[in-house]
Amino acid sequence: MHITMVKKRLADGSECRKCQEASEHLHSRGLWDRIDEVVWAQEGDAASPGMQLSSHLGVDRAPFFVVRERSGAQTVYVSVLQLVKERLGEAVTVQEQVQAIDPDDIGGI
């Protein structure tokens, strides 16, 4: 299994907030070393590797994760908690799930 994390770098050079939070979550659980590759989607640069991968896979948010199996099958995860639970074999608490809800992702709030 090969895990690629796609992170967004903003036009000012900083890493997006959600990408920082996802990285911190993986580090805090001791799972960062399970990420095999980090690819950057540069804001405003459609030719950047992360933007190309995002376009190819039809993903419109960052971070996201691409898990490739030896068989060539791949699965895309847009949630670090879903990745942790389904692919990294770690439990995810209800509290973590609630804390991961971002009002920016919910319309009308």
Residue ranges: model-predicted function:
Residues 1, 33-40, 98-107:
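Charged, low-complexity, helix/coiled-coil-prone segments
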Residues 1-37:
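Local sequence-structure signature of Cys/Sec-based thiol-disulfide redox active-site neighborhoods
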Residues 6, 57, 76-80:
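Broad hydrophobic/π-residue packing in well-ordered secondary structure
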Residues 9, 41-45, 69-70:
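Short beta-alpha junction loops
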Residues 36-39, 54, 67-71:
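Solvent-exposed, well-ordered amphipathic alpha-helical segments
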Residues 39-61, 87-95:
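Thioredoxin-like thiol-disulfide oxidoreductase module
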Residues 63-65:
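Compact, well-ordered interaction domains used in eukaryotic information-processing assemblies
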Residues 67-108:
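Non-catalytic, surface beta->alpha helical segment in thiol-disulfide oxidoreductase systems
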